[in-house]
Amino acid sequence: MKLLKYPSKEQWTELLKRPALNTENLFDTVRSIINKVRAEGDKAVLKYEATFDKVTLSALAVTPEEIQVAGTLVSDELKAAISLAKQNIETFHASQRFIGKKVETMNGVTCWQKSVGIEKVGLYIPGGTAPLFSTVLMLAVPAKIAGCKEIVLCTPPDKNGNIHPAILFAAQLAGVSKIFKAGGVQAIAAMAYGTESVPKVYKIFGPGNQYVTAAKQLVSLRDVAIDMPAGPSEVEVLADASANPVFVAADLLSQAEHGIDSQAILITTSEKLQTEVMAEVERQLAELPRREIAAKSLENSKLILVKDLDEALELTNAYAPEHLIIETENYMEVAERVTNAGSVFLGSLTPESAGDYASGTNHTLPTNGYAKAYSGVSLDSFIRKITFQEILPEGIKAIGPAIEEMAANEHLDAHKNAVTVRLKAIQNS
């Protein structure tokens, strides 16, 4: 980790750079896989599963028997934990239901919105070094609440052709309709265009590596919607002298163990805390099973000392972290001044892990500075809002002349005429 003291504003841009990925030829590679899946369907997906996931599959779909067996392989303790998390996620996201009210904008003119679930959604759950069954809950639970009729899930199998039982248990619990053994670019392409087995969906959700991210971006150009641009995970801890260095170090490491391209940053007003956190990170790192991954990630990480909370907040809002932990004396007051962040964790007893798993908030969040413009996944991500309007005779009389005037000045005579013929009909009735 890099220790930095009182950096000038001129240094901030360089200071806040995310780890750079080598994307040379990335999109060309991804595009060729997408085109192959689009043309050849299941045959191409099975071929790429053999190539990239090193598994020979006879079919892509997970069978009911596999789901049933998976339930017996998950411990009662983990089942209880997953069920508790599901309940909290359900409670929080159900509270976000949209209730559209009819609004009379003027006499005889009424407008309103109706919320409708996206009919078919696709969820991508990465494989890699950890089974992310928590992400199944974060995506499938709000999809179910939103009223999505078909929830399709793709996740890469292991070399024996099996999916982690906790992923299957969570998927069944959350109401996933269909599960497929497919990972990477081929999974995104299958959901975007459909194959003999995998249904075409209207919107794709879920994290992934740079290939998955590139695939989502390419298919979203014209064929399907996606949740948001995604990149390596990140956390910032904003702390003052009141913070516990043990807690801060644990939070930084919990992010660092995600992957070698993750980023963890401390911004603090206390030089003493900066020094103590550095030592504590080294101590805790030595005890972690995933210490090699975390250590590599920490090369991208920084402990930054600033002069006061005003500067800390300015730097924070410039960085726009995916996760922001505020461990300061008056953390609620500090939180009020945060304008750019994906999800915020307040006080010394609120670790990022809580939001990652079970507090109820969603952990699918904007990274790479996109928190300046994007929100994290919520119930709104799975719905569309359709607008309605109704105009009665008194309404068209009141609003009609204004429409005619505006249409005439935009030289759109047919627009004007659509109102004029109605006004004449009312006059002659």
Please provide the spans of the model-predicted regions.
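A glycine- and small/hydrophobic-rich beta-loop-beta segment
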Residues: H258, L266-A341
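C-terminal core of ALDH-fold dehydrogenases
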Residues: A318-S429
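Conserved small-residue-rich beta-alpha loop and adjacent elements
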Residues: V103-F169
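N-terminal Rossmann-like NAD(P)+-binding subdomain of aldehyde/semialdehyde dehydrogenases
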Residues: M1-E119
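Short acidic-hydrophobic, aromatic-tinged amphipathic segments that line or gate anion-handling sites
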Residues: M1-P7, K178-G183, L303-D308
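Conserved NAD(P)+-binding/catalytic subdomain of aldehyde/semialdehyde dehydrogenases
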Residues: G175-Q263
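Flexible, glycine/charged-enriched surface loops at secondary-structure junctions
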Residues: F98-V103, A225, S262-I267, E287-S297, ...
